[in-house]
Amino acid sequence: MSVSLKLRIAGLAGLLMSPLAQAEFSIPGFELVHTVPVDTALGTDDLRQPGPVWSELFDGAKNSIDIGQFYAADHPGSVMDRVIERLEAAGKRGVKIRFLLEEKGIKLSQASTLERLRAIPNLTFRVLPYARVSGGIIHAKYMVVDGKQAFVGSQNFDWRSLEHIHETGLRITDPTVVSQVQAIFEQDWKAQQALADNQPVPLPAASSAPPRTGNYLVASPQRYNPPGVGDSQLELPRLLSEAKHEVRVQLLDYAPLSYGPDKTRPYYAVIDNAVRAAAARGVSIKLMVSNWNTDKLELPYLKSLAVLPNVQIKIVTLPEAKQGFIPYARVIHCKTM
């Protein structure tokens, strides 16, 4: 399996599979949440933004908050600043908080933000070197509150993700899916403890592929998925193979490339083959990517896809914020299909 797919929970694209999820913005058990970059005309008045949603989750927590994130970065006076205040308030009233961060995300994080998180009462902070588990990273962005509500999306625990990056996420109250997100957190939490104790990482019990009925979660890498959680590397191509009329995809970048040793980019065609096969049988493919998807390594693959019949590709550039240049921001970061 390519390293690029060894990511803990693959992001919103392919994460939640529901036979009911079509054009509606809300279905029972799920609320679509949208980060609208400030100083743009991309507003969606019928969707809430993640700052208020996360604050509401933390304010409503009674017993526990579990957070799995790639990295953490705050900024004074930002929406994230206020969100962390709500997390601090939860810890002060006795809510048990577990925060799990990817080891490779430490260098991307703000040191002051990590110090602030570690200082929260009743918060246990752990760092997981996921490369020692599967060779990849935790790229997940999720939280679970009281084992009854969850949030999963493209938003990093980063102030820019709440104000200056185009993002999507789901607030989840569906009991089955919440329990599956919780199970993934527990698996990774135990993995961190095992590595800290120089013990083998326990593998989840082997299980057959879950039935594709109702609402269900998929994640990767498959070998570390708890029972009942499907394999995103199988599900995404399968969804594309079942498409009859149209597929719309929005994401940061698109290229049939993985991440190998010594900064190599091995060819990885699983998803790309499925996209091309769908276009070949007449399915309309509409792909929207960010302007970060134009480097000399990735652009040729994008061009080779764009020349195919039934394929439309748009490269999107977001305007600079009125306050000036903000590094690692002003970009499409959604992962939706």
Predicted regions and their residues:
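Hydrophobic helical h-region of N-terminal Sec-dependent signal peptides
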Residues: L12-G14
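N-terminal signal peptide c-region/cleavage motif recognized by signal peptidases
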Residues: S18-L20
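Charged, low-complexity intrinsically disordered terminal segments
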Residues: A23-M337
